Amino acid sequence: MPQSTIPSLFLLIFSLLTSLNTALADASTALVAMEDSQNPLIRISTSKGEMYLELYPLEAPNNVENFIALAEGEKEFTNLKTGEPIQSRYYNGMRFHRVVPGFIIQAGSPAINPLGLQVSLLNDEINANALGLDQIPALNPDGSFADVLNIESKPDFHEEILTPLYSQRNITDVEAALSRQYQVLETLQELSVKSVYENQGYRYDDSLESRPIERGTVALANSGPDSNGSEFFISLTAAEWLWGKYTVIGKVVEGQEVMDSIGNTAIDPGQFSSLSTLIYSVRKAN
């Protein structure tokens, strides 16, 4: 070997060892930061760096199992072009396609899966009582709505509270609404936040533990009750108006600086952006 190549070869080996040690240190730090080292630890490698997620299999067993199976390539799909069965690590090559700075970063939509892979939907796994939603009145004494409901306008009130309540009470026309308006008013005064969500179709499981959505929480995106699939989001802040409506599956325990870096640039989910963060891989780290 020429003498001149020895320093460059040494630098290459040193660089590889350093990067390996850094990765090991990150995983080691993540394990220390975990609430329970027996829980699954997931590494998300992205173009902005790595994040480590601790998952909560006892709190959302079916949805955590599904997330891991998608990440590890354990699910069998059908190739839409050939009709042949295919197994693929679902999240590899996807992007954080929706970013709202100061709020959430979101990825995993079947609509933008590189292979067009579609997933089955699972039920929610949420305990509203554990979140205290059964103890929060929907109406405040001054007639305003509980902050957690995030009711900001009359259309919000009709869509989120009144229409579901009318449906639940089988009130189908204006005449019925007028004749039962005092009954409806009494019901409104007795509603808890949990009851509001139940009228919207959410169902809860008191046997599970549930956590609030806080900074770093990993939860499943949905289009309404019992519509959990592959899409997930990481919250950049506490978001009490999401409690009871989204199944929490874990938390970022290492790499929050990467999470924040991804969250610095707004990304519109309706159009592709080269500024969106690429996901290299999602896989178990323990």
Language-model features, listed with the residues they occupy:
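Bacterial N-terminal signal peptides
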Residues: 8-19
